[in-house]
Amino acid sequence: MNRSDLLENPRTQTESGFLLIHKPVGMTSSDLVVTVRKKLGFKKVGHTGTLDRAASGLMILPIGSCTSFSSVFLEKEKSYEAWVRPGESTDSGDKEGEILESLSKEQTETWFQEHQEKLRDLFEQVPTWETQEAPEVSALKVNGRRRSDLFREGVALVPAVRKIKIYRYELGEFSPESISFQIRVSAGTYIRKIVMDISDRIGFPLRLEKLVRTSIGKLNLNQADSYESLLDGKIKIHPPETILDFPTVEVPDTEVRNVLNGRKIKLEWIPVNEFLLVSPEEEILAWCKKEEHGIHELDYKYLRVFPKN
């Protein structure tokens, strides 16, 4: 069976690869991993970054030896479609949190009529933002514990400020009922915190109503299988060469065994930074990284070797 075919009898599968799944609202990233293990029978399943329970969208789940590549996706750019509800705010910035303020429809419409130009200006300034303070309700760890757990216990948290970059931004609907935008951001950017910060700056309650992650790096949501397909046990395994961005260097048959045993071999060329060594059959043998300032044919190191089963 081709590795990119649908799984017909998943519990017999021993191969590695990636699953692209559309996570539904109401499920944590960890919940999705558990479901994959139960439904498909894979013992080794990872994920490449969390997606809030209240959000839906693309999740990349590596299986088998490809779990070694989980960290690769943590630093990828990500795209989202967001819908904001004017007139209500929560401590988490989305509908999962505790309500801090809630205005009536009439109050919201009255405020909007008087201040919509200033509010629009704040939303249009988002592409200029360069730093962001992580929300108190988040999965970030402080001494091994989630910030959200500490916040709920009343522990005072030190602000966790990080640099962010907005690569693309488009403001859509703008009304007292709903504000929407599309955005592409650097890794670690919280979309709900953008909404919370705008709310704080203007003194008007706002929160995320809906958030959909539409891409991670070069991978898009339209490539993902539905959650229903996962429950039916029919889901696509994507081979690593179609998912990973690394350049490849082919290893001759005579050197394959040396690579699998972790011995360096002479390479005709070494790509910049990280790369993959592959067999003539295009099987991934090793994940490598060029040594800093390396110019010699052996100036690289193995990050991970993938022995054959």
Curated annotation (Swiss-Prot):
Record protein name field: tRNA pseudouridine synthase B
Family: Belongs to the pseudouridine synthase TruB family. Type 1 subfamily.
GO molecular function: RNA binding; tRNA pseudouridine(55) synthase activity
Keywords: Isomerase, tRNA processing
Function: Responsible for synthesis of pseudouridine from uracil-55 in the psi GC loop of transfer RNAs.
PANTHER family from the UniProt entry: PSEUDOURIDYLATE SYNTHASE TRUB1, TRNA-PSEUDOURIDINE SYNTHASE
This enzyme's EC code(s): 5.4.99.25
Disulfide topology: none
Catalytic center residues: D52 (nucleophile)
InterPro entries: PsdUridine_synth_cat_dom_sf, PsdUridine_synth_N, tRNA_psdUridine_synth_TruB
Catalytic activity: uridine(55) in tRNA = pseudouridine(55) in tRNA
Presence of keyword RNA-binding: no
A single GO BP: mRNA pseudouridine synthesis
Natural source organism: Leptospira interrogans serogroup Icterohaemorrhagiae serovar copenhageni (strain Fiocruz L1-130)
Gene name per UniProt: truB
Enzyme class: isomerase
Domain of life of the organism encoding this protein: Bacteria
